[in-house]
Every structure is written in structure tokens, then in C-alpha cells.
Amino acid sequence: MPENAESSIVSVESRELPERITIPPIRGEMVHLRPATVADRMDAIDAYPGASGITGKDRVAERAAVHAWVRRSVAWANGETPTESGVGDPESRRTVAWSIITESDHDGDGEIDAAASYNVIGMIFLIDIDGWARSSRIQVILGQDFRGRGYSRDIMPRVMTYGFAPEPAGLGMHRIWVAVPEQNTRS
């Protein structure tokens, strides 16, 4: 076999996702991200009211989806095999979840804005991660009092940079897409 042919075989990217992932902390200008946990208090920040206008799902469905995404992210970080195959249902594919953390007093009242939720103001996800197509969807969920302040604009490009970065520094995605319901005119 010619030497060039062998080196080209070695350089072909794997289309398999790793069995375990290390979710990196990410620092933005306004907030920072850390791996999400099941204990993060999304209900404390009123993340689900008005969900149908933002994500197209009602409050109950949105809450269930967020909890499932976080569980799948934690499981992947722990090296646990997913219980769903992900073949027929994109919602059951691998997920990476970060909690959005603030340490700021943006409203000037002398207190950290999200003390009741341990500084969590929302979550950002890479969901529907498809190793074969090297693609995923990005989704941001913010607490009701934290919407419209530029947090998504701060963190989405940073998460996308991680998603596009070649392995092992990132996920090596070729495409990251977002789905926004028609009624969510702000996004």
C-alpha cells in the first residue's frame, strides 16, 4: 500500500461519538457556563412560563424535555450507555447541557441576580447530537427575569465554537442549527 493511502485512512474522522465526554466550563463576557446537574433549580428562576411562545412546547412538555436533556448529558459525562438508541427519535440522541451562571448584580439592588437559584439563570444545550452527520441543535432556556438581556448572544457563539472545534478539544460538528417557533419574534 502506498504511504499516502495509509496516512489518508488514519486521518479519516470517526463518525462515532465518544462513550464518555468531559463537558468543559466556558466563560463568556457576562456569564459563565458549567456542566448542568439534575439539581439545578430551573423552576426557581421561572424558566417555563411562556414556553409555548419561545420553544413551541407547553410548560409541562418544556420542563420534561429539559429534565431529559440534563439526565442524558449527565449520563454521557459519566460514561453511561443511553437507554434509547437515538435512531428513530432525534430527541433521544446524545446531549450536552450547561447551566448558565451569573455572579453579577445587573439590577443594582446590591444582591447577585440569581441567589435563589444558586446563581443559575438558565441552561444551554447541544441536543440531537448526530455523530454520523456531525450535526446538532442548539437550544437556550432562560429564566423569565433574564430574557432579553443579551445572555444568549454572549454564550451561543462560545458553545458553537466548542461544538465546531475538532476532537478532542470539541465535538467536531459540521453543522449546528437552531429551531425557533414563528411566534418567538425576539429570537
Regions found by a protein language model. Name each.
Residues 38, 63, 153, 182-185:
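Alpha-helix N-capping/helix-start residues
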Residues 135, 165-180:
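Conserved GNAT acetyl-CoA-binding A-motif
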Residues 148-165, 185-187:
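Conserved acetyl-CoA-binding loop-helix of GNAT-fold acetyltransferases
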Residues 130, 147-151, 179, 183:
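Short, well-structured alpha-helical patches and their helix-loop capping segments
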Residues 1-145, 166:
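GNAT-family acyltransferases
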Residues 143-144, 162, 176-187:
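Conserved beta-strand-loop-alpha-helix junction that forms the acyl-donor binding cleft
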